């Protein structure tokens, strides 16, 4: 030997150590083994052994940071901060490896996606309460039968392919085999290893190797937060915490720290505290928690735990107050600019937004002193289009922020012409010889509408549509790189701008002057890949367009502000997260945590200078009335039995409260498992409320065996395995199996008879509404979040002999506007079926005057967006919105959370009383 350790690797993941003449079992996936081999070579050069090898690999590991498929060792080297968990598709599609800090701990563990872990037999609710609290802050991951054309995340393959057939029909679960989908995935491992990085561990947004140097200005670095923290007076901080501990109520202490009311009462009973040390020594007697073989361990004592949390939050408030002062300074510049126009800015920090409506406000100020203020549309804007006062003011507001080198959120309510104002702003820049290049990023469903609006409002602008196949985009890149002055505005989608590396690099190299992000709430998650990639596109000026700046919570609102003004917010993001992340105790309700007065007041002060929001009630006197009605549906006896059997015949609230108590005692690993189970249970409960055909009830196993045998006669199944086909069918729902029977002649005879799709509580309610709508000459837009529900509703429309159109995420972008035009032109089409995600944004369906929301959303603003597809400029009739909610089901709880989020939005806007009145009407 030459002194070097020689290690050889085999295809099955084992490796042979030539030095010790030992063939070792595959404790590492092959990819990591390759990395070890490379580390070994480096260690030999350094003269070290195994410790050096582990040290080198550890350093390599720290460079992995993105949640992305790892396709090669070279790709691995380019990344940073290795994930605590990842999946080796090379060994087994269902064998995750858990990395807990050292390579010796890198061992296979059972898959989190196997059927045995989907359901807790003793408590099928699992950790539903924890999931509800989690989903109330952010939307749940999209299940496979849910529609979202822009969604990049989904539930695991094995989870999404499961059905509740065995639970609903009391069938014995079949032994788990790889389904056809899983076998296909196993044979097409082109993406390599899938790394999943917990959001909390993402610390630095390092640019990729080909990123622009400008990316550094968008980093979210711990050192930035430390710079703010270093300015805090520690003595003053401790004094504030001591005051709070001595003055706060029991409920306030529980809300701030997330402790139980009993713990808060115990702490309050020990007051007064002469100093913090007196609070730190408080220790509440608590039961000892068993920890299996590791013995028994107690939690952190009560005093240190509560004082520590209060210190962290109060430190966050100190940093946030410094941010507020900076925002107020910038807001002062904006205010002086508005006053120079001769306008009175009606925005205050208490209202949380700017509201400039019309020129009547100029009367007390006289004529504009600022020559840049315009009172008529820009010269290059189409002369045939008349702009309202509030729209011209919006153009001026955008240009003012542009001149001040700031950024803004144009948050007018849906239907008030944000697209029109944006195009007019581009026209104004053209008049001032600022010709671009500019960029507009929008959902795919709005692409054609943007093109039409550009042609309608400003045909002089040269528009470049960056969209199409990979080959087509390559041609566009070559053409533009050879002539960068060939366009003024580039138009593309969120998916293209944030997915392909070639597309991202191309967009970064364009050096855009203005970047506009339509439906800006797509950027609400600062930890997402989409957010990070779009943040890396440099621009001189950023504008977000959104009718709903607040989607779920204040943390998401801060993410939007951090996106448009990174130089303002990047130093305090960690402190902002502390303040605006809700801590919810088991006894405190969600609404109280969401509407925390201190959090809301600070959010208002930060957002006020940068958000322009006008409401329909302020600017559109002639817009017809919109009436919302919640239609409560009653289960039939059979539907109720199925639902209660699955829900263990217990109250949702009692189960949820019980589980959140249990969750507090969980380890991180158990907590992750509970969240996965809870997400699955939530989806199934929603499906049970929607329609029984979302499960396998009618197609028994004996029928499936006959179908599996018959379908072997189809050309594409000639060489398939009949047993595998049968097993795959076992995991399909009734509607999937029925559609399969309609597709293949060999199994046509197995189609469902007697129209079982009409037998559901929501369908019975829908039938009555549609019958009355047809008699009254009303036209209906019918929304559902789930594509399989739309499949069922298509069958319902046919049974009712109603003409309809359908639009969902799978509809080709080129045909979407044609469907809308067809609905406008043909009044005999009674119903337009739309998925809430794909059809809820940027679409004008003012020719309809009835909106039906078949299922409720965790995010109420998705529903509001859907409503305003019909209730917008151009509507001639009063609009009625019906929302279906099944009594005594999970939907009532989702609706309650939605009401709390709407109340938070109203509080930020100063309209809480109005919302309360509307809720009472409902």
Curated annotation (Swiss-Prot):
Gene transcribed to yield this protein: fft3
Domain Helicase ATP-binding: 399-567
Intracellular or extracellular location(s): Nucleus; Chromosome
Assigned protein family: Belongs to the SNF2/RAD54 helicase family.
SUPFAM superfamilies referenced in this protein's UniProt entry, alphabetically: P-loop containing nucleoside triphosphate hydrolases
Protein name as it appears in the record: ATP-dependent helicase fft3
Self-association and partners: interacts with the GDP-bound form of spi1.
Keywords noted in UniProt: ATP-binding, Chromatin regulator, Chromosome, DNA-binding, Helicase, Hydrolase, Nucleotide-binding, Nucleus, Phosphoprotein
Residue ranges, annotated region (Disordered): 139-177, 198-224
């Amino acid at each position: 030997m030459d002194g070097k350790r020689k290690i050889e690797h085999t295809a099955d993941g084992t490796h042979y150590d030539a030095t010790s003449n030992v063939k070792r079992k595959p404790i590492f996936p092959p990819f990591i083994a390759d990395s070890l081999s490379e580390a070994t070579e480096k260690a030999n050069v350094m003269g070290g052994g195994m410790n050096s090898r582990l040290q080198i690999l550890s350093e390599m590991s720290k460079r992995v940071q993105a949640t992305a498929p790892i396709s090669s060792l070279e790709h691995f080297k380019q990344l940073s901060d290795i994930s605590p968990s990842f999946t080796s598709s090379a060994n087994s599609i269902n064998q995750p490896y858990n990395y807990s800090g050292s390579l010796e701990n890198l061992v296979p563990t059972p898959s989190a996606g196997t059927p045995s872990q989907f359901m807790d037999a003793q408590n099928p609710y699992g950790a539903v309460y924890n999931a509800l609290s989690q989903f109330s802050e952010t939307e749940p991951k999209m299940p496979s039968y849910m529609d979202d054309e822009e969604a990049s995340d989904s539930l695991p393959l094995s989870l999404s392919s499961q059905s509740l057939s065995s639970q609903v029909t009391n069938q014995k679960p079949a032994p788990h085999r790889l389904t056809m989908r899983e076998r296909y995935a196993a044979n097409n491992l082109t993406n390599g290893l899938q790394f999943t990085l917990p959001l909390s561990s993402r610390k630095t947004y390092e640019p990729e190797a080909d990123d622009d140097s400008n990316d550094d200005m968008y980093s979210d670095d711990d050192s930035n937060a430390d710079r703010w923290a270093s300015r805090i007076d520690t003595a003053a901080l401790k004094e504030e915490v001591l005051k709070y501990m001595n003055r706060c109520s029991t409920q306030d202490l529980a809300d701030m720290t997330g402790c139980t009311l009993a713990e808060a009462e115990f702490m309050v009973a020990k007051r007064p505290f002469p100093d913090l040390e007196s609070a730190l020594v408080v220790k509440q007697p608590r039961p000892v928690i068993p920890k299996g073989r590791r013995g028994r361990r107690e939690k952190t004592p009560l005093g240190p735990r509560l004082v520590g949390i209060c210190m962290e939050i109060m430190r966050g408030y100190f940093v946030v107050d410094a941010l507020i002062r900076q925002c107020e300074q910038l807001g002062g510049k904006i205010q002086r600019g508005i006053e120079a126009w001769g306008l009175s800015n009606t925005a205050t920090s208490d209202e949380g937004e700017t509201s400039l409506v019309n020129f009547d406000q100029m009367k007390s100020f006289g004529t504009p002193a600022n020559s840049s203020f315009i009172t008529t549309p820009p010269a290059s804007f189409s002369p045939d289009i008349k702009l309202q006062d509030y729209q011209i003011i919006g153009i001026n507001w955008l240009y003012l922020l542009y001149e001040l080198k700031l950024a803004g959120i144009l948050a007018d309510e849906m239907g008030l012409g944000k697209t029109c104002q944006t195009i007019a702003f581009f026209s104004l820049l053209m008049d001032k010889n600022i010709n671009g290049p500019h960029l507009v990023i929008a959902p795919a469903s709005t692409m054609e509408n943007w093109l039409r609006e550009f042609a309608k409002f400003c045909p002089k602008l040269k528009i470049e549509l960056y969209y199409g196949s990979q080959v087509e985009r390559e041609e566009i890149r070559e053409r533009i790189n050879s002539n960068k002055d060939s366009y003024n505005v580039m138009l593309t989608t969120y998916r293209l701008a944030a997915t392909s590396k070639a597309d991202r690099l191309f967009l970064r190299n364009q050096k855009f002057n203005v970047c506009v992000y339509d439906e800006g709430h797509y950027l609400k998650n600062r930890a997402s890949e989409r957010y990070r990639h779009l943040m890396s596109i440099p621009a001189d000026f950023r504008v977000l367009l959104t009718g709903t700046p607040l989607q779920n919570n204040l943390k998401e609102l801060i993410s939007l502000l951090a996106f448009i003004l990174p130089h303002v917010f990047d130093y305090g993001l960690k402190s902002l997260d502390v303040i605006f992340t809700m801590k919810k105790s088991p006894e405190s309700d969600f609404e109280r945590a969401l509407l925390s007065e201190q959090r809301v007041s600070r959010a208002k002060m930060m957002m006020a200078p940068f958000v322009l929001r006008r409401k329909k009630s302020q600017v559109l006197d002639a817009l017809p009335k919109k009436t919302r009605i919640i239609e409560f549906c009653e289960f039939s006896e059979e539907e109720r039995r199925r639902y209660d059997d699955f829900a263990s015949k217990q109250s949702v609230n009692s189960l949820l409260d019980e589980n959140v108590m249990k969750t507090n005692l969980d380890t991180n690993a158990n907590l992750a498992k509970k969240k996965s189970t809870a997400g699955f249970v939530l989806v199934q409960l929603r499906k049970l409320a929607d329609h029984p055909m979302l499960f396998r009830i009618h197609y028994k196993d004996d029928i499936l065996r006959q179908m599996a045998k018959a379908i072997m006669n189809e050309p594409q199944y000639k060489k398939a395995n009949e047993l595998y086909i049968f097993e795959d069918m076992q995991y399909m729902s009734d509607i999937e199996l029925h559609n399969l029977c309609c597709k293949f002649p060999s199994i046509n005879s197995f189609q469902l008879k007697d129209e079982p799709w009409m037998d559901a509580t929501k369908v019975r309610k829908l039938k009555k509404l549609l019958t009355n709508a047809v008699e009254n000459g009303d036209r209906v837009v019918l929304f559902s979040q789930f594509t399989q529900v739309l499949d069922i509703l298509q069958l319902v429309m046919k049974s009712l002999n109603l003409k309809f159109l359908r639009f969902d995420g799978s509809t080709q972008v080129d045909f979407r506007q044609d469907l809308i035009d067809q609905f406008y032109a043909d009044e005999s089409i009674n119903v337009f079926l739309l998925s809430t995600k794909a059809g809820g944004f940027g679409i004008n369906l003012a020719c309809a005057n009835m909106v039906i929301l078949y299922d409720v959303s965790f995010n109420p603003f998705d529903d509001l967006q859907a409503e305003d597809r019909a209730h917008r400029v151009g509507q001639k009739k009063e609009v009625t919105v019906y929302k279906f909610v099944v009594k005594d089901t999970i939907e009532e709880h989702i609706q309650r959370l939605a009401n709390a989020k709407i109340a938070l939005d109203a509080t930020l806007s100063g309209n809480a009383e109005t919302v309360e009145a509307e809720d009472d009407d409902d």
